[in-house]
């Protein structure tokens, strides 16, 4: 019997190109096994139908994953106009039909109407939780749970291709935006139906699909080559301001103390903390009124020193 490779501490971010047909968790576990990593988590669920950018956080990077969940995203979506699906995408059954002879002008007007700050009701077929269970578990049993509308921002909808009943759009949006629901909203504005036949996440938090790696490509590399593709943990928080602390102040932070600090930094946002030799320590909060730094999320000392 062949012994399984031992799990090892891996710290960093992998930009994975999730294939169609796999759940986000299945793709995550495949990546974790390729790296023989002890711990891994992803930042934002993609439906099995969807493909594209899925940042995977190994080890200490998982501590900072939340800050990527809050980031804006971009997608390319393929719609079929004139048909409604039970799930909002091609995995469901067609449950209603209406006119599909939509003009480009009609479609453009509808896209413009759904651009900006809007309210969106999350779909039943989603991973949102109700009483500890994802909504899709209720939906599969025919149970409808009341969902509150959420405020989202659709920054832009660009029409990449249009040949009714097919339409391809590129969407830039805030976190929490459901492209299936957005597509249904566009169709509703025209007086018809629509569902997704393809969805690809192309950007998140400034990362692009061009930077990502497929599971197949990763499987063809050796361990050293794979490790070389990992991004450092601090890429997840690169949008925050940064500062440098001396070794004594860093030690105080790591011991739960609040070192004295005076610098012109905002007091209402996390701050990236580095040592004088450039090592990432973690995130801290600058308490400007008392000139102190308070630890928020810190790297494990051993991982930080590696």
UniProtKB/Swiss-Prot annotation:
InterPro entries noted in UniProt: PsdUridine_synth_cat_dom_sf (IPR020103), PsdUridine_synth_N (IPR002501), PUA-like_sf (IPR015947), PUA_sf (IPR036974), tRNA_psdUridine_synth_TruB (IPR014780), tRNA_sdUridine_synth_fam1_C (IPR015240), TruB_C (IPR032819)
A GO biological-process term: tRNA pseudouridine synthesis
This enzyme's EC code(s): 5.4.99.25
Top EC class for this record: isomerase
Catalyzed reactions: uridine(55) in tRNA = pseudouridine(55) in tRNA
CDD domains: PseudoU_synth_EcTruB, PUA_TruB_bacterial
Pfam family, one: TruB_C_2
UniProt GO MF annotations: RNA binding; tRNA pseudouridine(55) synthase activity
Keyword line: Isomerase, tRNA processing
Keyword Isomerase: yes
Active site: 47 (nucleophile)
Function in brief: Responsible for synthesis of pseudouridine from uracil-55 in the psi GC loop of transfer RNAs.
HAMAP family to which the protein is assigned, alphabetical: TruB_bact
The family this protein is said to belong to: Belongs to the pseudouridine synthase TruB family. Type 1 subfamily.
Protein name: tRNA pseudouridine synthase B
Gene name of this polypeptide: truB
């Amino acid at each position: 019997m062949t012994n399984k490779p031992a799990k090892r501490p891996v710290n960093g971010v992998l930009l994975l190109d999730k294939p169609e047909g796999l759940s986000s968790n299945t793709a995550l576990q495949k990546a974790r096994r390729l790296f023989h990593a002890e711990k891994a988590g992803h930042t934002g669920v993609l439906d099995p139908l969807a493909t594209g950018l899925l940042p995977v956080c190994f080890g200490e990077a998982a501590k900072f994953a939340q800050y990527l969940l809050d980031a804006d995203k971009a997608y390319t979506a393929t719609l079929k106009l004139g048909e409604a699906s039970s799930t909002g995408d091609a995995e469901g059954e067609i449950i209603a039909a209406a006119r599909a002879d939509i003009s480009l002008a009609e479609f453009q007007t509808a896209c413009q109407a759904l651009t900006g700050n809007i309210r969106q009701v999350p779909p039943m077929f989603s991973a949102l939780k109700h009483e500890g269970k994802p909504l899709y578990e209720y939906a599969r049993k025919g149970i409808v749970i009341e969902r509150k509308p959420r405020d989202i921002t659709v920054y832009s909808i660009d029409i990449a291709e249009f040949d009714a009943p097919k339409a391809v759009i590129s969407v830039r949006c805030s976190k929490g935006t459901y492209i299936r629901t957005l597509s249904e909203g566009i169709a509703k504005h025209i007086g018809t139906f629509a569902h997704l036949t393809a969805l690809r996440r192309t950007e998140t938090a400034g990362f692009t699909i061009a930077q990502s790696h497929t599971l197949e490509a990763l499987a063809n590399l050796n361990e050293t080559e794979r490790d070389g593709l990992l991004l450092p943990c601090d890429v997840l928080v690169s949008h925050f301001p940064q500062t440098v602390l001396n070794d004594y102040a860093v030690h105080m932070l790591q011991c739960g103390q609040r070192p004295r600090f005076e610098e012109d930094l905002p007091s209402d946002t996390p701050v990236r903390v580095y040592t004088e030799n450039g090592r990432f320590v973690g995130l801290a909060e600058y308490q400007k009124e008392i000139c102190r730094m308070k630890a928020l999320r810190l790297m494990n000392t051993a991982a930080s020193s590696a």
